[in-house]
Amino acid sequence: NVKTSRPQHLTAKQVISKTAKHFQIETEEICSSKRSKHIVIPRQIAMYLLRSELHMSFPKIAKELGRKDHTTAIHSIEKIEKDSKLNPAIRDNIASIRESLYN
C-alpha cells in the first residue's frame, strides 16, 4: 500500500466540487441554506473533509460553505466523525471522495 500525501494545490473549492460530484448535486447546493437530507449529508461530509484534508479552521470552513456561524461546522464535523463509526456507507463515501481528490 502506497500512502498518498496531500497535494499542495488541493483547494477548498476542489473538495466541495468533488463532494458535490460524488453525490450528484450542484456545488451551489452544498453552499446553499437548503436543509434536505440529500444536501445536508454531502455538506457535512464536505466540512469534515475540509477539516481533515486541508486542516482548515472552523470559522474558515463555515465561511467557505456560506454558513454564518462556525459552530455549524463544529457540529457537522462531530456528527460525521460519530456517524462514520456506525455507518459503513458514510465511511465509503468519504473514502471514495478522498480517492477522487488524490487521483
Predicted region positions:
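Terminal-proximal interaction/regulatory segments of ATP-powered molecular machines
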Residues: 28-103
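AAA+ P-loop NTPase domains with strong preference for DNA replication initiators
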Residues: 1-39, 52-53
